[in-house]
């Protein structure tokens, strides 16, 4: 049976704005309070989805969340009508309103961790929604994330869904942004690679000093248990705390893996040789030939990697066995990074081509190509069991473009978030979107009695 890696990209929501909410994310902080263009952001994301689908890659869409999150504001003591809640929050606690309007769910690499059926004890694809408890604006996402994933992968024979881990710092979980998988073929058993920033209960592990380590070892271990993964199919690695302090807030900012290949920066991990040795040995036991591509600091400094998002790229397998690296425009604009990529594609390794996309609206908030997608390896029967309304096609692309143009503003500043009409616009748009994507009632406003 054939198997595929399907990339489900997050559709940018109508409240896309630059709130500067993500401490430790250099781009998010440095572009705080700029005016955003939600319509352009959504169109940029859709253009990437359509281009990759046109190239033959399997591509899906993951819906955005209801924002502003009025229910979250009510839990914080704001009362009255929805308009009252928004306007009072704007007067008394603008940072809370900004957080409740965040469109950060577009970065669906943080939506969940996914284990393919070939790796799990019960032979189903497993999903665990990420609690994202390090940042308030993201910690409110997982209930809707779980409902959306449940509506997309809604066949119990093939798919198992787990609730987010306990929402405490000891189990901080950032989803697939700190997880990748190596395999000879997508439908065969592979090795799942969990990267953490600190240990919650063992003080012998080092930790960053400036920025928070968002993923704990204990969270990664819990997800592996929930998914029924075997010890011979899992490797845990600690991210280098020094690079977290340089703005590498998730592992997908310093490495990317696919198939049998890990593309990583020299400074990405602690005890790199031991980590690579485990990956090589465990993948070999499953018939695979692990290949590591190390980018030396002499070629690309960590600062350049963070600024360009070289590693927040998509490493995609072509039918001929070669790989394509999808990078943001910022890589072409960085002289050192672009020179390195020229060498990479000409030296006879697996990466044969680099494709550049303009994702500036997302990049200015600290999210590149890899942030925008959740990878799900599926066998043919599993892909057929996915809600087909979310699979990217030419007609769906056209429908979504028209939907965006109808409902999205082309400029959004902080003051606009206090406009109750924005909530009406968002709910109208999302109500229509659930019909387009055949999701049913996944949003809180659709579920109210």
Curated annotation (Swiss-Prot):
GO MF entry, a single one: N-succinylarginine dihydrolase activity
Segments of skewed composition (Low complexity): 27-37
Cited InterPro entries: AstB_sf, SuccinylArg_d-Hdrlase_AstB
Name of the top EC class for this enzyme: hydrolase
Active site: 174, 250, 371
Chain segments carrying region Disordered: 23-43
EC number: 3.5.3.23
UniProtKB keywords: Arginine metabolism, Hydrolase
Catalytic activity: N(2)-succinyl-L-arginine + 2 H2O + 2 H(+) = N(2)-succinyl-L-ornithine + 2 NH4(+) + CO2
Biological pathway: Amino-acid degradation; L-arginine degradation via AST pathway; L-glutamate and succinate from L-arginine: step 2/5
Superkingdom of the source species: Bacteria
GO biological process: arginine catabolic process to glutamate; arginine catabolic process to succinate
A Pfam entry, by short name: AstB
Binding site for substrate: 19-28, 110, 137-138, 214, 252, 365
General function of this protein: Catalyzes the hydrolysis of N(2)-succinylarginine into N(2)-succinylornithine, ammonia and CO(2).
HAMAP family per the UniProt record, alphabetical: AstB
Subunit: Homodimer.
Family of the protein in this entry: Belongs to the succinylarginine dihydrolase family.
Protein name listed in UniProt: N-succinylarginine dihydrolase
């Amino acid at each position: 049976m054939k198997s595929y890696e399907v990339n489900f990209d997050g559709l940018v929501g109508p409240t896309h704005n630059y709130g500067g909410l993500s401490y430790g994310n250099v781009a998010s902080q440095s572009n705080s309070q700029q005016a955003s263009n939600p319509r352009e952001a959504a169109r940029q994301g859709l253009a990437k989805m359509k281009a990759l689908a046109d190239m033959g890659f399997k591509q899906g869409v993951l819906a955005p969340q209801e924002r502003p999150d009025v229910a979250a504001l009510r839990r914080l003591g704001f009362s009255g009508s929805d308009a009252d809640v928004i306007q009072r929050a704007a007067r008394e606690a603008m940072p809370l309103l900004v957080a409740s309007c965040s469109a950060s769910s577009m970065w669906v690499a943080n939506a969940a961790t996914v284990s393919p059926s070939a790796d799990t004890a019960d032979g189903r694809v497993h999903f665990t929604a990420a609690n994202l408890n390090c940042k308030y604006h993201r910690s409110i996402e997982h209930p809707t994330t779980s409902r959306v994933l449940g509506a997309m992968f809604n066949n119990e024979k093939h798919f198992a869904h787990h609730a987010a881990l306990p929402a405490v710092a000891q189990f901080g979980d950032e989803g697939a942004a700190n997880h990748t998988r190596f395999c000879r073929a997508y439908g065969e058993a592979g090795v799942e690679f969990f990267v953490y920033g600190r240990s919650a209960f063992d003080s012998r592990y080092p930790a960053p000093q400036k920025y928070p380590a968002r993923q704990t070892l204990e969270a990664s271990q819990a997800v592996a248990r929930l998914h029924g993964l075997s010890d011979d199919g899992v490797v845990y690695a600690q991210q280098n705390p020094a690079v977290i302090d340089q703005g590498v807030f998730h592992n997908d900012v310093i490495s990317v893996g696919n198939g049998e290949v890990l593309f990583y920066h020299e400074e990405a991990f602690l005890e790199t040789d031991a980590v690579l040795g485990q990956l090589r040995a465990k993948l070999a036991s499953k018939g695979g030939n692990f290949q590591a591509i190390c980018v030396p600091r002499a070629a690309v400094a960590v600062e350049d990697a963070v600024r360009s998002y070289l590693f927040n790229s998509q490493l995609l397998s072509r039918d001929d066995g070669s790989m394509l690296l999808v990078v943001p425009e910022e890589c072409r604009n960085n002289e050192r990074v672009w020179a390195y990529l020229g060498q990479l594609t000409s030296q006879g390794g697996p990466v044969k081509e680099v494709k550049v996309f303009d994702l500036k609206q997302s990049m200015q908030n600290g999210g590149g190509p890899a942030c925008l997608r959740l990878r799900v390896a599926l066998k043919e029967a599993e892909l057929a069991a996915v809600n087909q309304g979310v699979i990217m096609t030419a007609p769906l692309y056209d429908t979504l473009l028209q939907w965006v143009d109808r409902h999205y503003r082309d400029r959004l500043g902080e003051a606009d978030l206090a406009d109750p009409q924005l909530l009406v616009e968002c709910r109208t748009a999302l109500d229509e979107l659930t019909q387009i994507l055949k999701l049913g009632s996944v949003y809180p406003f659709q579920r109210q009695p």
